[in-house]
Amino acid sequence: MKTLGEFIVEKQHEFSHATGELTALLSAIKLGAKIIHRDINKAGLVDILGASGAENVQGEVQQKLDLFANEKLKAALRARDIVAGIASEEEDEIVVFEGCEHAKYVVLMDPLDGSSNIDVNVSVGTIFSIYRRVTPVGTAVTEEDFLQPGNKQVAAGYVVYGSSTMLVYTTGCGVHAFTYDPSLGVFCLCQERMRYPEKGSTYSINEGNYIKFPNGVKKYIKFCQEEDTPTQRPYTSRYIGSLVADFHRNLLKGGIYLYPSTASHPDGKLRLLYECNPMAFLAEQAGGKASDGKERILDITPESLHQRRSFFVGNNHMVEDVERLIREYPDA
């Protein structure tokens, strides 16, 4: 049995900027995940369920657990003196860590994806993305350090809190998964170099918004529902409403996750920096593909911290089918 800590140290030589700091950074995220795991498991017993009464910068009502997870992860990263600053879905602006100007890395995160599902005991997750800063080491980080295209990520991953808690990450050398053993207090390696199955047969989308979708996406949904033996259609529809949970299932079973633009969200709804980029990095490392329907997610240069984007991620052939239909059936 190999622990996450042992595995990271063992694979450190594969990382082009190996200094030991990235190992410590991932350990800090691991600690934060353990704390969140502990409190999610007793969420119904303490007063951390429901809405907090506050709103984030996007105008969304923050759940109590959103704020709790954000503070715990922020504290875990700040305590190690290895991160110069963070950007979070729950913070209006970047958070500069004073006294950490010497640090080489910045972290972007969605502390608790799918938190509205907590009240009904459905899987949620944490998403993280790590970059090397671009401003000089020794100075305070600026927004420039965070507004980098996804192809500059040095590591990314997620934690899914479900029937078991799993941490999945990549440093650009494959995707690896670890299951948390609460009796030992450690994450243990359960899957190394994860890959999408050759063919996917599941599509994940909120079909309740069908009437609002672009024409190409509507055509793709119909394509998924058609009977066609050579392509093993119709596909199965599975949608949890938690990006981490839907992505994780499709990675294991084969499938595509779709969150297109709508009339009310013409640029898409998912955040490019906190959700799309890290999941796109993981998908490509697992042999999949991620697109906004027209271009590769990882090649998009962000313009703002909370920028949104349409998002299609999963098996190559499924994402390519969506892109093809979006091209063939443009909106008027």
Swiss-Prot record:
Q: Which domain of life is it from?
A: Bacteria
Instruction: List, alphabetically, the GO terms of the cellular component aspect.
Output: cytosol
Could you give the cofactor binding note from the entry?
Binds 2 magnesium ions per subunit.
The UniProt record gives the binding positions of Mg(2+) 1 as 89, 110, 112
Give the EC number(s) under which this enzyme is classified: 3.1.3.11
Q: Name a GO molecular-function annotation.
A: fructose 1,6-bisphosphate 1-phosphatase activity
Q: In which pathway does it act?
A: Carbohydrate biosynthesis; gluconeogenesis
Keywords for this entry?
Answer: Carbohydrate metabolism, Cytoplasm, Hydrolase, Magnesium, Metal-binding
Where do the annotations place substrate binding?
113-116, 206, 239, 257-259, 269
Q: Name one GO biological process term.
A: fructose 6-phosphate metabolic process
The record's principal subcellular location, in a coarse class, is cytoplasm
So what does this thing catalyse? beta-D-fructose 1,6-bisphosphate + H2O = beta-D-fructose 6-phosphate + phosphate
Q: Which cofactor does it need?
A: Mg(2+)
Location relative to the cell: Cytoplasm
The family database entries (InterPro entries) matched by this protein are listed as:
FBPase_C_dom, FBPase_class-1, FBPase_N, FBPtase, Fructose_bisphosphatase_AS
Q: Could you give the subunit structure recorded for this chain?
A: Homotetramer.
Q: What name does UniProt use for this protein?
A: Fructose-1,6-bisphosphatase class 1
Which species does the entry assign this protein to? Enterobacter sp. (strain 638)
Q: What is the lineage of its organism?
A: Bacteria, Pseudomonadati, Pseudomonadota, Gammaproteobacteria, Enterobacterales
